[in-house]
């Protein structure tokens, strides 16, 4: 995954006069222009916060991070709690809520699920545009009465995931969770929309083996890798076992038992 979307032309756009100052702030932070001829993407600032819009006649709708409404809220309320496969994969059990580093945070969906179940989460998203969407979503979540206690358990870190893990300071995370980009073939509208938008920006993860190696060196208890169900394991040490779902699976690399 490249950190800078070299092949894409990106502008920052205010969706109204009242958002110009904030748009200028994001443009300065990300080193992006406010107007760009023939832009491929527009990072838009408006009443719903920050959103990324692909431009062009066949472009999907905008993508934003929203922990208060929509899919995140539905999963928080009705998603199955600690019985969810991701909860089992990271080792959530009675009296066990591990400290988890999500080193491929993306839009923060999986990290939010784990935080809603009581895990203290650290998140790394190395693609600056996606990191900006995540930062904005966390800030808006902190303003919501019900969501604020959850996002308070989510700390966003900046930088290259591999470098951050190799140079980690302080107590290591008990569990490291990885979901590297892979050539997804799912047909759902949501996956198609997000993958169509993100793939030109982030590509796949050719350095997934180095990501796994850094995670295995840092995690104190286990590493969990989410993969499409029929995808090969990441090159390197083999997982001890896997939890299989309908469209994805979780490869488990245990180091030490998680105990209450």
From Swiss-Prot:
Q: Span of the secretion signal?
A: none
Q: What is its EC number?
A: 2.1.1.242
Question: InterPro entries, from UniProt?
Answer: 16SrRNA_methylTrfase_J, SAM-dependent_MTases_sf
> Keyword S-adenosyl-L-methionine on this protein?
yes
Disulfide pattern: none
Residues engaged in binding S-adenosyl-L-methionine: 125-126, 179
Q: Where is this region: Disordered?
A: 234-260
Q: What Gene Ontology terms describe what this protein does at the molecular function level?
A: rRNA (guanine-N2-)-methyltransferase activity
Q: Where is composition skewed (Basic and acidic residues) in this entry?
A: 241-254
Gene3D superfamilies named among the record's database cross-references: Vaccinia Virus protein VP39 (3.40.50.150)
Cytoplasm in keyword set: yes
Name of the protein in question: Ribosomal RNA small subunit methyltransferase J
Origin organism is Pseudomonas fluorescens (strain SBW25)
């Amino acid at each position: 995954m490249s950190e800078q979307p070299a092949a894409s032309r990106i502008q920052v756009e205010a969706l109204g006069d009242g958002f110009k100052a904030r748009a200028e702030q994001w443009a300065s932070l990300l080193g992006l222009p406010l107007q760009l001829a023939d832009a491929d993407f527009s990072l838009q600032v408006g009443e719903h916060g920050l959103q990324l819009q692909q431009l062009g006649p066949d472009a999907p709708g905008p993508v934003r991070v929203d922990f208060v409404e929509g899919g995140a809220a539905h999963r928080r309320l009705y998603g199955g709690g600690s019985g969810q496969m991701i909860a089992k994969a990271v080792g959530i059990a009675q009296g066990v809520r591990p400290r988890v580093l999500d080193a491929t945070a993306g839009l923060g969906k999986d990290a939010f699920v784990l935080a809603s179940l009581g895990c203290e989460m650290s998140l790394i998203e190395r693609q600056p545009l996606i990191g900006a969407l995540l930062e904005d979503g966390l800030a808006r979540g902190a303003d919501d009465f019900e969501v604020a206690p959850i996002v308070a358990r989510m700390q966003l870190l900046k930088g290259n995931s591999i470098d951050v893990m190799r140079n980690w300071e302080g107590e290591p995370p008990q569990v490291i969770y990885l979901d590297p980009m892979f050539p997804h073939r799912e047909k759902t509208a949501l996956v198609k929309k997000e993958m169509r938008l993100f793939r030109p920006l982030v590509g796949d993860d050719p350095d997934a083996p180095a990501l796994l190696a850094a995670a295995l060196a840092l995690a104190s208890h286990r590493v969990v890798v989410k993969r499409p169900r029929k995808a090969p394991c990441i090159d390197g040490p083999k997982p001890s076992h896997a939890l299989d779902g309908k469209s994805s699976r979780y490869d488990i690399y245990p180091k030490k038992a998680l105990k209450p």
